[in-house]
Amino acid sequence: MDTPPGKSLAVSAETLYLVNLLLLPGVAFLVLLVLFLTRYRQAAPLAANHLAQTTGVSVVGGALLVSVILAIILLGGFDTGWTWVVVVLYFTFIHSTLILLGVLGLVRAMAGEHYRYPLLGRLFQP
């Protein structure tokens, strides 16, 4: 069984995406961004797909998490209990969804298949 070209880079991109969400937020994102900036242009189509998807969804997903939470806090009031209930529910739901989609992306990368993240992934087609 032959390994598709770019499979290891695709798996690395998806792994860094999950590490960014679960273990080292920010640090893993910077490593993923450097990997994208240095390897995307000459990457095989499989690797380019996973690099573009993980980097793009990390940027947009992170921006949406932060901006919506700030909007909820500003609109709901910093000292209101219900504001924090909504913030925790929103963060838990969106963060868990991003993790689940990242696991699906990792499975597809390990299988040597292309993957597009639902909703946000259309913006980052290679």
State where each predicted segment sits.
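Membrane-interface extramembranous regions at the lipid-water interface
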Residues: 1-21, 29-57, 103-126
